[in-house]
Amino acid sequence: MMGAMQVVLEALHQGDYDTAFETLVRTLALAQGQDAAEAALLLAEAYSLYGEGGIEGANRALEEGLVSVPTLESHPRYRSILGEMRALEGAPEEDVRQILTKTSDPHALYHQAQALMYLGLPEEALEVLNQPLELPAFLAWRAHTLQGKAYERMGQAAEAAAAYKEASRLAVGLEHYWNLIDASAMFVEAGLGHEALQALREAQPDIPELEDPEDAATRYYLEARSQLLLGNPGLALDAIQRALEKEREGAEPAHGTPLVHGQALMQLGHPREAIEAFREAVGRAEDSDKSYALHELAVAYLESGELAEAESTLREVMRDPEYGYQGEAYGDLAEILYRLGRYEEASQAAHEAIRLGSLSAGHLILGNLACDLLHLEEALEHYALASEEAPEGSRDWVTAQQMAVDTLAQLGFRRPDEIISRSEAVLPYLHPADEWHQTLNNYAERARNMIGGNRTLN
């Protein structure tokens, strides 16, 4: 019996399910008493790996175990697998909790965590999974994968990525590969481009010789998003074009592919080309994804100088009450209205952006409005706030730094040290051919002369 069970455990770990099921069915037919009960429990566990597709088989195995050992009904693993199956069938939470029992059995705890996940209780599942569980190899990696799913459902992308990465370390073959792909996806969501690319590189040796176009498209999509995070739009464009090619070869068209295509083109400074990509993304997307794609399209119109189209597209976004970036949308609308010369509306939109948390965009427009009225003190205050709130290197941050220096210069080169420090901070983000590059250099040089120093720019 022990030899047969070892064969089953190894087969399950290696993904050789035919051998595992054949051995279990044969063992269950020949065994009696506790041996039959143990075989039935392991058979039920094996069926449980198939999710909904394994419900009937798992229930049948549990029933066969009861025939051999009627007292099996009180066994923690029996009750945990039964609870998992009931949760998977959609039973009420209260009914499932009555089945589950307090236990320290690692197998039982794993299946309880699965049941809790099926009930939509990832926090409770994590309380179970974060305990040290000594599980056989075929369940050990799955416990970490389940941990990753729980963190993912809770919106904790970095923690999910770490769990999937650990699962990949313990898994073999395609399961090793898929956990690395999941880890890469979560690293991307966490904004960790380097770690995402590293996970993709680790998955490379496990890519099937005849890779499904769908899987290849996913891989190239993640590579493109990783490169965008790392500020490599050219490499991102290469990768996303490969993903689009895989869609033409049969992969399911996803809204994210043209969306990332457009984002790469935007970073490369080609907003007009990006418009077509974002239009395609809008056509493919639904619900909040569609609103996000519309927002990207509006920004592309804005950058292309097509202000009327930008405004109408953005107002469509703002009609979605569930959209999670309303503050940013109001900030972009404020810029559009400012550039259209509708200053009162621009001011209202900017204040609404600030109220909704998009501080840098709102203060930037309010600074521009104050500057136009020659209210330079007020303008400087807004630009300073915008530069503090915007992420360093972002479009808003660069613009706020430029305008703060320019305003200080208009105020008679007040605070020359600040002119120098702001100029030194922003110059690395500007192309030498950018007219602001020379302007800031000139301002900084004059400020240094005023304080009699010999500081040089980086």
Provide a role label for each language-model segment.
Residues 6, 42-44, 77-81, 111, ...:
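"A position-specific structural signal for the A-helix of alpha-solenoid helical repeats
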